[in-house]
Amino acid sequence: MNRIFFILVAAGVPLSVIGSLMHWPSAVLFAVYCVTIIALASYMGRATESLSIIAGPRIGGLLNATFGNAVELIISLFALKEGLTGIVLASLTGSVLGNLLLVAGLSFFVGGLKYKRQEFNIHDARHNSGLLIFAIIVAFVIPEVFSVGMGNASKLNLSIGISIIMILLYVAALYFKLVTHRGVYQPNNAAQTEEEEEPEWSGKVATIVLFAATIVVAYISENLVHTFHSVAEQFGWSELFIGVIIVAIVGNAAEHASAIIMAFKNKMDIAVEIAVGSTLQIAMFVAPVLVICSIFFPTSMPLVFTLPELVAMVSAVLLMIAISNDGDSNWFEGATLLAAYVIMAIGFFLL
């Protein structure tokens, strides 16, 4: 897999530069940009993981929290700069649906084909359930309900206030998990496994890779955003479909692959943490940061989703909680999550 990503980066980065300079067709550029970003995201993930192991569990957890969805954040910032707030909100929706239904579904399904029953930490599952309900059902639904009788300025002020609260609670959740209650709910062999882990790269190499990959992703993301309109017209895609399906998958593809591989190796704690942890990071950190950053762009972005987006996200949260709160999984539960994702994808495609 690493060799494939290396080839994609080695070919994709030059092609991205040449294609943008020579003004290749938008559809070709769109495909090249997407594949290259996916490959670069894998390098960012591996560099972050190496730095996390070297820095220790607490700093490592903070690094993962900061860079875990860096690609999604970068793409969204450039989309905000272009005033594409609909695509940004849709990509946030897509990340939630993709992580809770597609990634968790594939992880449960692929792992379940090899193992009849897989277990993961039930305490983490229940702790994350509460945060999911807060982040999606409370923090995302309330702005929609209250904004009905509000003007644009009031909507933005409400969204900024909610965003600040969400970031503070996310920091508190990290402090709870990494400091005050670290290891309290972990199985006895978790610490031993963690101690045996070796970084793939040295600190210097990982830092250089992370820095270089971030710069290149930023460059390609800016060009990718410029292809959205023409690609949407050419293929008949709506802004919702581009954001919910395309941008969300491109921004998280490398992380998605990692979760599925972990499930196949029966490391379900890691697979579930990637799926649910990434969802919480998107909802409680990336979305609020984008709302706050939007006030510095010509077009601000209140945290107000469309009704289909809200219904889809709430449904995904409730389904994931119902399936994961028992602390075990099987292939049929994975198939159920995947079926829900396909139904929602069809709905967004037809909107």
Swiss-Prot record:
Subcellular location: Cell membrane
Effect annotated for changing E72A: Lack of activity
Assigned keywords, A-Z: Antiport, Calcium, Calcium transport, Cell membrane, Ion transport, Membrane, Transmembrane, Transmembrane helix, Transport
Topological type in the membrane: Multi-pass membrane protein
Effect of N252A: Decrease in activity
GO cellular component, one term: plasma membrane
BP-aspect Gene Ontology terms: calcium ion transmembrane transport; intracellular calcium ion homeostasis
Induction of synthesis: Transcriptionally regulated by the forespore-specific sigma factor, SigG, and the general stress response regulator, SigB.
Gene Ontology molecular function: calcium:proton antiporter activity
Protein activity control: Calcium efflux is tightly regulated by intracellular pH.
Annotated consequence of substituting N64A: Almost no change in activity
Family matches, as PANTHER family: VACUOLAR CALCIUM ION TRANSPORTER
Subunit structure: Homotrimer.
The family this protein is said to belong to: Belongs to the Ca(2+):cation antiporter (CaCA) (TC 2.A.19) family. Cation/proton exchanger (CAX) subfamily.
Function: Ca(+)/H(+) antiporter that extrudes calcium in exchange for external protons. Does not transport sodium or potassium.
Name of the featured protein: Ca(2+)/H(+) antiporter ChaA
Source organism: Bacillus subtilis (strain 168)
Name of encoding gene: chaA
